[in-house]
Amino acid sequence: KAFEAAILRNFGGLEDFERVLIHALRRSCGQRVLLSLMADDTLWLICTRAEADPLGAVLLDLAAPAAPCTEEALALRVRVIDWRHCARRYEEVLAARHTS
């Protein structure tokens, strides 16, 4: 629930976030799209080169397609993301930060 609340705070809900993520994948042609938890506990969606060091703690790391894809293909890719894994990673990072 904490991860869902963070998505809501930062993106306006999971459906809105999925639309933003699809748009980022479409525009990032051949790069990486990261969902990162920053030091101030905000979530950032970052488009970066494959070899670049990520900012923040990465919760989700997707390779954007090298060629433009249809909206349907990108939406399908987003629908199969394991959000439970992202939520577990979010909880782990927060717990590690608050016990240090």
Which residues does each predicted region cover?
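Feature for soluble, non-membrane regions of globular proteins
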Residues: 1-100
